[in-house]
From Swiss-Prot:
GO terms for molecular function: RNA binding; RNA endonuclease activity. Residues 200-260 form the KH domain. Keywords: Cell membrane, Endonuclease, Hydrolase, Membrane, Nuclease, RNA-binding, Transmembrane, Transmembrane helix. This is Ribonuclease Y. The chain crosses the membrane at residues 4-24. The lineage of its organism: Bacteria, Bacillati, Chloroflexota, Chloroflexia, Chloroflexales.
Length: 510
């Protein structure tokens, strides 16, 4: 019994000890877990704070950048506004100066008119006095003395009138030039064309050199069929991966170019397929021309054009003059002529319609003989345009003498559009040869010392020998030089001929 009791006590003691040890280790494990979690929490908090600082820094940098950009834009806007204000102020000052100049000239004219009136009265008084004196001295009859006096007065009056006419002509010319520059400037500003010159491309690039053989075909049947159907010559030479299309008709050349590209893309190249593709392409190009003609007529606000005129107008899309697209040139002329007609109080509809159609003859000038201005005028007449429009078209290159304001406006619009920088271009060799030819023509006249082609060939300045060419001969020389340039040279726009005659008188004070 005692042994059993001790055994039970020992068992209980062991259990108690094991339980204590278990509790001890459990407490230690929980404590270490808590410490690890706390460390992890602190680490997360530090990372969050670090990220918060980075985000705040980035936000501050972005805010600073946005603020700097806004300040820069604000400065630019202020500078732009300041420049605009300065330009407006300068324009206002120029206008004020011009108005003051006009008022001064008006006062001067009135003063000169009063002086002329006084001089006329004085001349009458002197005439009477001279008549009395002559009659007294020479014992001439009154009629004889009257004839002598009238002859003298007539001579003096003619001189005064000629001098006055020259002054008025010069003043009128200055005023007219000033008004013309203003009207042209307003028209150009309102037109604001952004078109640049272009060249017609007649070269078709090939994906590979092997396609040249397929274009030629067996024994040349493909190329012969293509040339026969389109009327365009295909030049296959040593140019790598390219063939050239040659034809005087730009529409046929465009049809051939588009059809050849379609055949190359399709891959089937044989005579029957060529005929089918060319026929479809012709219909497409005709549709494109009609659409282009309608578009340009709509943009120019010209209504009621005959469908054939619309089609011919669209054909100008494929014509160029010195690199300038003729269709776009016609639209630009129409807008310029309309604005100038509105400023002058002329018929806007006649001016813009004639300007839009002024080069319509170029659409068929390779088919019809004659100047394109007269060809276009005849087409416009047959298709129902008014006589005023027909005359303006025919006169825009002086094939007819211009008789109406609208005709002169078409001439001016054509010259402005062609002379605009960047509108037309020539090769360097042709440009240099044209300048040399201008100088050669001018120096071929006797009495000419030197000649200079300036303003990109738009003006020729001729220096003459003052002892051989007087003022009257200078006028004839300018006319003769201009006439010879017209007869012997080809050039876009117009060329101004300026004769410069300089005389010097030198003496020495000793």
């Amino acid at each position: 019994m005692t042994e059993l009791l001790w055994a039970v006590v020992a068992l209980l003691a062991g259990l108690a000890g094991g339980a204590g040890i278990g509790v001890y280790w459990a407490n230690n494990g929980v404590s270490s877990l808590v410490q690890r979690k706390a460390a992890e929490a602190r680490l997360l908090i530090e990372e969050a704070r670090s990220q918060q600082k980075e985000i705040l820094l980035q936000a501050k940098d972005e805010a600073l950048r946005i603020r700097n950009e806004a300040e820069a834009e604000l400065r630019e806007s202020r500078q732009s506004l300041q420049k605009q204000e300065e330009r407006l102020q300068r324009k206002e000052e120029n206008i004020d100066r011009k108005l003051e100049g006009i008022e001064r000239r008006e006062r001067l004219i009135q003063q000169r008119e009063r002086q002329i009136e006084q001089l006329t009265q004085e001349a009458e008084r002197l005439k009477r006095q001279q008549a009395q004196e002559l009659e007294r001295i020479s014992q001439l009859s009154r009629e004889e003395a009257r004839s002598i006096i009238l002859a003298e007065v007539e001579r003096e009056t003619r001189e005064d009138a000629a001098r006055r006419i020259r002054e008025l002509e010069q003043q009128t010319k200055e005023e007219a030039d000033k008004i013309a520059r203003k009207i042209i400037g307003l028209a150009i500003q309102r037109c604001a064309s952004d078109y640049v010159a272009e060249m017609t491309v007649s070269t078709v690039n090939l994906p590979s050199e092997e396609l040249k053989g397929r274009i030629i075909g067996r024994e040349g049947r493909n190329i012969r069929a293509f040339e026969q159907i389109t009327g365009v010559d295909i030049i296959v030479d040593d140019t790598p991966e390219a063939v050239t299309l040659s034809c005087h008709d730009p529409v046929r050349r465009e049809v051939a170019r588009v059809a050849l590209l379609k055949l190359l893309k399709d891959g089937r190249i044989h005579p029957s397929r060529i005929e089918e593709v060319v026929h479809k392409t012709q219909l497409e190009i005709e549709q494109i021309m009609r659409e282009e003609g309608e578009r340009v007529a709509y943009e120019a606000n010209v209504q009621g054009l005959h469908p054939d005129l619309i089609k011919l107008l669209g054909r100008l899309k494929y014509r160029t003059s010195y690199g300038q697209n003729v269709l776009q040139h016609s639209l630009e002329c129409a807008l310029l002529a309309a604005h100038m007609a509105a400023e002058l109080g002329a018929n806007v509809n006649i001016a813009k319609t004639a300007a839009l159609l002024h080069d319509i003859g170029k659409a068929v000038d390779h088919e019809v003989q004659g100047p394109h201005a007269l060809i276009g005028a005849e087409i416009a007449r047959r298709l129902g345009r008014s006589a005023a429009i027909v005359h303006a078209i025919a006169a825009h290159h002086y094939d007819e003498e211009p008789q109406t304001v609208e005709a002169f406006l078409v001439i001016a619009a054509d010259a402005i559009s062609g002379a605009r920088p960047g509108a037309r271009r020539e090769t360097l060799d042709l440009y240099i040869k044209r300048l040399e030819a201008l100088e050669t023509v001018a120096t071929s006249f006797p009495g000419v010392q030197r000649a200079f082609a300036v303003q990109a060939g738009r003006e020729v300045r001729v220096m003459v020998q003052p002892d051989q060419i007087d003022d009257l001969a200078s006028i004839h020389l300018a006319r003769n030089v201009a006439k010879k340039i017209e007869e012997s040279l080809q050039y876009p726009g117009q060329i101004k001929v300026t004769i410069i005659r300089e005389t010097r008188a030198v003496d020495y004070a000793r």
